């Protein structure tokens, strides 16, 4: 079966539309709401993220000779890296702290029977300290390598 190659022109047209929209919008317009939680800028970030996922699948499939879908850690960590890098440092810290506080409150008040189900599936959803501590240790070691040697 021959693949319908109309995707080439459709993709190019959508990319041209994206480029034109981005070129004409002000920063204020980029912050304009799109639905309840998104903005125009988030739409662009979402498109970039999922296009990076498609690029990963194409590269890995070509390398392996079979379709390769990224596992969760690659999908989230490797593909998200350029987006995280674009967040101003203080905003990244603020987001991490606010999210940790909200999650801590939610976990503390969560229905025990459901919490046990979640813990049985993946305990690190409940014991967030494991993941937080791992990365905080890495950050502190990078900032002060002599003290950790």
Give short role names for the model-derived ranges.
Residues 29-75, 112-149:
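Short, contiguous alpha-helical
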Residues 2-9, 32, 63-69, 94:
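Solvent-exposed interaction patches of small proteins and small membrane subunits
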Residues 76-116:
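Acidic/histidine-rich alpha-helical segments that form the ligand environment
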Residues 5, 38, 42, 82, ...:
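Positions in alpha-helical segments
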Residues 4-11, 89-96, 125-128, 132:
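Hydrophobic packing residues in well-ordered alpha-helices of helical domains and bundles
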Residues 15-23, 51-55, 97-111, 136:
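Structural signal for well-ordered, non-membrane alpha-helices
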């Amino acid at each position: 079966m021959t693949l319908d190659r109309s995707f080439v022109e459709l993709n190019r047209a959508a990319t041209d539309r994206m480029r034109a929209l981005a070129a004409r919008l002000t920063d204020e317009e980029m912050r304009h709401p799109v639905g309840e939680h998104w903005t125009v800028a988030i739409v662009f970030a979402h498109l970039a993220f999922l296009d990076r996922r498609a690029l990963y699948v194409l590269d890995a499939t070509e390398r392996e000779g079979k379709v390769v879908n990224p596992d969760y850690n690659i999908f989230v960590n490797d593909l998200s890296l350029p987006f995280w890098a674009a967040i101003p440092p203080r905003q990244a810290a603020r987001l991490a702290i606010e999210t940790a506080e909200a999650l801590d409150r939610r976990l503390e008040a969560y229905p025990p029977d459901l919490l046990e189900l979640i813990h049985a599936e993946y305990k690190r959803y409940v014991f967030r300290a494991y993941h937080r501590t791992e990365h905080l240790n890495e950050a502190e070691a990078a900032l002060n390598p002599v003290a950790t040697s």
